[in-house]
């Protein structure tokens, strides 16, 4: 399983997603791509004395962040280099099997519908 993770989404980002992803990669051997501000992700590693990412992990740089106050309908147009939009585009392009974000739910559903698209025969996006 190849997971693309929005490292900048959520209240405790990027620390919580980055540390959680590292633990998952170590425990389960999951391939994970952290998407976000590369320097901030590296700062989390330095702060916790982590010299190298586990095997199968990589960082994909995205300079912008979707804020909880951003208009979900406009995020796709206005923040094309956000961690959420870049991650969804990676998923749509086949770079991963799943995309995870603790960021704006509205922006995630809108982005998933517009970028990744729905499965044929499915009319509404699902959350789980």
Which residues fall in each region the model found?
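Contiguous, glycine/small-aliphatic-enriched amphipathic segments in soluble metabolic enzymes
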Residues: 1-114
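Short, acidic/small-residue loops that bind anionic groups at enzyme active sites
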Residues: 110-128
């Amino acid at each position: 399983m190849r997971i693309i993770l929005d490292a900048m989404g959520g209240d405790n980002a990027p620390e919580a997603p980055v540390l959680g992803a590292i633990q998952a990669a170590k425990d389960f051997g999951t391939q994970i791509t952290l998407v976000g501000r590369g320097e901030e992700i590296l700062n989390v590693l330095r702060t916790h004395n982590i010299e190298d990412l586990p095997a199968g992990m990589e960082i994909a740089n995205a300079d912008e962040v979707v804020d909880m106050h951003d208009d979900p309908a406009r995020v796709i147009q206005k923040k094309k280099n956000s961690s959420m939009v870049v991650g969804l585009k990676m998923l749509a392009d086949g770079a991963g099997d799943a995309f995870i974000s603790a960021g704006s739910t509205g922006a995630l559903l809108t982005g998933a519908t517009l970028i990744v698209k729905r499965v044929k025969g499915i009319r509404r996006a699902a959350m789980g």
